[in-house]
Amino acid sequence: MTSFYSALGLNEFFTLVRGNKYPLDLLNRNFALSLRGKAKISRHMILKRISILNYKNLEQVELAFSPKLNTFFGQNGMGKTNLLDAVYFLSFCKSAGNPIDSQNIRHDADFFVIQGFYEAADGTPEEIYCGMKRRQKKQFKRNKKEYTRLSDHIGFLPLVMVSPADSALINGGSDERRRFMDVVISQYDKEYLDALIRYNKALVQRNTLLKSETPVEEELFLVWEEMMAQAGEVVFRKREEFIREFIPIFQSFYSFISQDKEKVGLTYDSHARDASLLEVLKESRTRDQIMGFSLRGVHKDELNMLLGDFPIKREGSQGQNKTYLVALKLAQFDFLKRTGTTVPLLLLDDIFDKLDASRVEQI
């Protein structure tokens, strides 16, 4: 089962039966759920309709949505997850599963197009268009005007997705957990996203110098290290603030779903906490030159996921891991709802898999 909740939030949901080229049936049902806390919301953004051509295995889809809850049923391989991924693409300018845009074009096709038709709380329509042809640059437009920077779109349509791929947050490398922080913070804080982009650009340049087979003057290193330090301090500070505010929300969701059976936590480690980031980079330079890349910096930060006092990767059962991930994503939704100016869309893909009956009932 695949679902998404509209920008009206999780207060009361209603589904409408609709059809399309694919057997994705929508059920009529009422849902109610109360979330803790009140959001600081100035507007809603409802996805009214989506049009998809040649995206992954979806040849042609035209769907109109309920403004509340939409639930999709179908056999494996019919395209339910790809439909959610198309909605995700409209928010983040990329696929949740495959960042190589050309590989998302349907086999035997030369292009894909995704169009989303949204409506703000005041009735203002918003049209988001993404199109790509093979061997050409992706086009991303809002109301027929192309973005000069895709980063300007991030946060306009906030979104949270719960999917089986979330297991990488526990079992994958630290880059997966940094990406989690980046995705959340970037949706409500433009300063963070700009600093992250500047940091990564400077990191690429510094790594190029580190790989140089000829001697590089210190002044050249300092240009990029100073940029990394300046942007990195912003990234560190905002990640630290986010985690501090996020932990109690996450713990509250986990406690509710597990019925207080376990305690969980998050801790954040960063080289920027050890000393001035510029000094950290300078001190690490000789070793970095030997290795050919930057060993220290906020690109090596770690978000530790704990069950009790131990890493959940080592201690958690399948059910505990799934509970942890669902609580993490529902807390992300609630956090963005409280912090941002627009209620996020919430996409749920096989949310109940690996959970026992009592935890399913709590959700």
Which residue ranges define each predicted feature?
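Conserved NTPase motor "head" modules and their coupling/switch loops across ABC/AAA+ ATPases, GTPases
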Residues: 30, 40-75, 216-347, 354-362
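Helix-to-loop junction immediately C-terminal to a conserved catalytic motif
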Residues: 88
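Conserved lysine of the Walker
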Residues: 80
